Each structure stands twice: as structure tokens, then as C-alpha cells.
Amino acid sequence: MKKNRPGIAKMPFFIVAVLCLSIFSCNNESTQTQTETVQKPAAFVKKAPAFNEDSAYYWVQKQVAFGPRVPGSKAHANCASFIEKTLKDYGLTVVVQTAPITTYDNKIFNLKNIIASYKPEFQKRVLLLAHWDSRHIADNDTKDENKAIDGADDGGSGVAVLLEIARQLSKADLKVGVDLFFSDLEDYGQPDDSDKPKMQDSWCLGTQYWAKNMHVPGYTANYGILLDMVGAKGAIFPREGTGSYFAPDVVNKVWSTAKNLGYSSYFTDDNTGNTTDDHLYVNTIAKIPCIDIVHMSPVTGSYGEHHHTHKDTMDIIDKNTLKVVGQTVLEVLWQE
């Protein structure tokens, strides 16, 4: 049985009217108060310093000037020394991993992974990585297929952005640790038309080794960002499938940062299929959620036309693209 509220029906009309008005007034005031307490999302505020695209461009030039950084070559050795010295000059803690690695063609190379750490004592960490070796063949070209490529974009651009970030870190006081991982033997994978026995997981050998043999025992990071082919004119960076599968929150973090910086024409919301790149093994072996900022066509899923060809030279490198990627990653770090 419904319980009646006593006395309301017997009150004079004007009292009831006043009471109703009072109740309405109170309810309306409560509604206004509730409306006023709804907070709008905080406006985005830039925190990172300006990324120097001229400096990054110079770092690409420096690498290409050594020649193709094919494992076992003099250019490879010289470039390794250059990267290591530059990182140490910026005051970072540097570890060089070396190990004999067998490739699909049954050759043995002395692997050189280079890891530089900013504030290594901090538990909260972000991993940034790029491969520094270049492809030993031009298997996507129609001429000189068996000759090594310059690798200005594929290899050179990612390293250049990381070196410029290292320079900025040397002057910073962040509340997060950062590890810059320069992986070796990423691009010595088995070509599709190889006459050699099929080798499983022939790509990204440096990262596979690192993930199984951490440079610091028990190392981990909150998340990782891989930079691969991030310097070409007209580059587009869709949401790559492997990263979206393993680390969707990291993809959203980076792409929303790029959007807030006005870079939506570069960092698009298109989705691509999965790729086999260093971040695959960071996710599956090291168990660190990691994404890939990589130049891909959102329509065909293929990389840039210069990929693994002799067109991958300084002629295709664009300072604006280096700026967009570098500034986005810097902002992600500074927002931490």
C-alpha cells in the first residue's frame, strides 16, 4: 500500500502553492549546481621545447655520409662509434650489447645494440627505439638489386630523431626515465625470393636478442614507441595494426598528442594491417606495450615507394616530416 504524506491535502491553497514554488526553486537550484560542477576537459597546453628539425636533418646526413650501414662493413663500425660517442657527449648512460648473430644466409655478424638511458634510477620509464643498420640489398628495386641502399629514411631518419631527442633530454629535468634503443640487424631479413632455406623470424634480430637478454637485468618500461621511416616527404603515419593490437592506449596517447599539435594530416586515424617490425618482439618477448610510427599507405598497406630501393637517399628526406614526428614524441615525454 502506498503511504500518503500527512497534511498536504488539508493545507490552504496558497500555502500549497508557496510550498510547491519552494520545492521547484530548490530543485532548480540543485540542477543548476549540478550543471555548474560538470568540468570541461582541460585545455591542451604544450610543454615540450621546440624540436630542431635542422639538427635532425644533419644527423641523417651524418649517417648517410658513412655509406650503407650494413653489418660487418666499415661504415657500420664507424656509425656505431659515432652514435655511441654522441650519446655519451650528451651525458646519457650508455650500454653497448654485442653478440655473434647468424643471419638467414648463414653469415655470422657481431651485433651492436646501443642503449642510452636518461635518469636510469627512475622506475617509471619510456622506451624509444629505432634501428640503425641499413638494408644490404635493394630487393624492391629493378636495378642493382644486390647492392646495399643508403637507408636515409629506413634507418637514418629514426636514429636522427632519437639523437635530437637525446640532445633535448641532456638539458631537461623530467619526472620520467627514458631509454633510447638503437637496434642492430633489423633490416637483414630474408627476402621473399631468397633461394636459402626459410629462416623463421629473420628480421629484427637485434631487438629479438635484446628482448631475451636485457641490457639491465629485469628491465621493463611503461610503454615503447618505435620510429621507422619517419623522414620522407609526404609521409603518412596511420595507426599500425600490431601496435593497435598490443598497445591501443599508447596509440591513442601519441595520435591525440599529434592532433593537439596540429599534425592530423600526418598522423591519420586510418588503420592498417599488422607489420613485422621491432615493436612486435618488444611486445611478444619483452612484454612491453609498444607501437610503431611508420610511413605506410592506409590504402595498400605498403611502405613508401623508396622502401628497400636505391631511391632511399637524402633527396627524399624532408625537415617538416622530421619536425612533426620529433615534436610529437617530445611532447609525449614532456606530458609525462
Report residues per predicted region:
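Bacterial N-terminal signal peptides that target proteins for export
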Residues: 2-13
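C-terminal motif of bacterial Sec signal peptides marking the signal peptidase cleavage site
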Residues: 22-25
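Bacterial Sec signal peptide processing site at the extreme N-terminus
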Residues: 28-38
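N-terminal capping segment at the start of a domain
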Residues: 38-79, 90, 301-316
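Second-shell loop/turn segments in exported
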Residues: 44-50, 65-74, 101-104, 145-155, ...
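A non-catalytic alpha/beta surface segment that caps or lines the substrate-entry region
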Residues: 68-121
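Active-site-adjacent substrate-binding region
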Residues: 98, 223, 230-336
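Acidic/histidine-rich catalytic neighborhood of metal-dependent amide-processing enzymes
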Residues: 147-249
